Amino acid sequence: EAALNGMANGALSGAVSGAITGGITGGLSYNSGATSAGKGFDTYRQLKNEIGSPGAGNEWHHIVEQSQIAKSGFSPQMIQNTNNIMSISKTTHRAISGYYSSVQPFTDGMIVRNWLAGQSFSAQYEFGINVIKMFM
């Protein structure tokens, strides 16, 4: 969470820092109780079988990335969870994935997904929502 505060102090664009300092609001559909609610699954395939298609031209996007099962030690049920996934356009999904693979000024030379490793689920979830807002 301290790292998120550092981002809000100017490392990211005004839109994202505003979202971080102003809280999560706007037109995004997500469940802020993702850390304690939702239906969890052992695999992504099981989750997709439950939720179905993301819709034409869309893909499923994990708010806290699947890589964080290994990197942060989160359980599959936390990541493969109905409260940790949303349908976004393929174009937006590719842009977000590229961002998570990039080095940003606030990541101390690490790619974003590695910088996130070890932060709490709730901090990563809030960060993920703010990244989605930045690209939508």
Regions found by a protein language model. Give the residues of each.
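Generic alpha-helix signal with a bias toward terminal, lower-confidence helices
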Residues: A19, A70-P76, F127-G128, K133
